[in-house]
Each structure stands twice: as C-alpha cells, then as structure tokens.
Amino acid sequence: MRWGQTYLQPTDTTCCAQGLTTPQHHARLSANLFLEECDLRECLVIYVDAALDRNGRAGCGLAVFVRGRAVYTESFGFSHIGGSAQLEAHVCAGALDLAASRWPYHRVIVRTDCAPVVRSRMPSSDSFRIAVHEVRERCRRGWRVVRYVSRKANPAHELAREGLKSLSRQQVLAAA
C-alpha cells in the first residue's frame, strides 16, 4: 500500500510543497477530538480507514491533520483478497510509510477504528500477523504510534466509503 505516490495525479493540489497543502476532500474533526489534537500541536495525526465489500472490493481513506486542520486527504478503491483487519493493518503501514517519506521530521500518530490492529498481542492468522508486524516495525523507526479511534470520530471513514464507491463506478463504466 503506497499512499500519495501511486494514486495522485501530478496536477493534484494535495501535494506537499513547503507546508502549503490543500485538502482533496472535505474532512472535519469532531469538537472533542479537536481539543485532544490541541495537545499534539507538534504531531502529524493521520486518520485511516478501509472498507471492504463481499466481492473483494476495497476502499481506503486517509486524512492528515496538523494542529487540527486537514492538510492532506486521499481516497481510492482497489481489489483485495483477505480480511478486513488485515486490510486495515496494511492501510496503517502505508500511512506510516507516507509520513516517513513526506513528513520525515514530524512525530506521527496514526489513528484507526480497527481495534484488532491496535490491540492484538498475538494475531490469529498468518496474513494478519504479518500485516500487524509490518505496522509495528514501522512504529519502531521513530516517533510513530498507532492508536484506536471510534468509527464515528474517524474522518477517514467516509473517505474509505467514497473510495469503495469510486471503484464500483469504475467497474460499471468498464463493463459498459
């Protein structure tokens, strides 16, 4: 999963240039999360989410906040073979990679609404264990952590649904 490199067009206004970024999507934090974010002014907070349907289509959403303001958003869809927790772990790992490449000098908090990614001590399946291991390895490389956030408070939730819808629309157009 590679955010920000494979899926953005060169003309997109969301690319980071000297701190001047424009969000691609409208993303907002709830009022109580904004107060929590105020304590993290030196941090980059990345909200991630993934949506998976029963046909193996997935949508991913990402919203990056600095000081409570969205500075970057992205959503896209793709095919996925595997479970939803595994997908969410891969999305978290991709967000950590994006932060390391685009914002290498920021402390990073990745927030996901998938509790098993954050809380699993010994993941059940091999594929999920590998995905969680990828997340933990990326967290060891610096000031990077992954934390739980409720789905209701996750601004990336709607972006993931939007990414899933965009994939469905692309497949309908391709079939026509």
PLM regions and their residue ranges:
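Basic, amphipathic N-terminal segments that precede the first structured/catalytic domain
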Residues: 3-47
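Intrinsic-disorder/low-complexity loop/linker signature
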Residues: 5, 56, 68-69, 141, ...
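Secreted/luminal cysteine- and crosslink-motif detector
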Residues: 16-17, 61, 140
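Short, motif-level signal for alpha-helix interfacial/capping segments enriched in acidic residues
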Residues: 26-30, 92, 132
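RNase H-like nuclease fold core
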Residues: 33-86, 97-102
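RNase H catalytic domain
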Residues: 50-55, 93-161, 166
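Loop-to-helix element that buttresses phosphate recognition and phosphoryl-transfer chemistry
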Residues: 87, 91
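Flexible, low-complexity interdomain linkers flanking nucleic-acid-processing modules
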Residues: 166-176
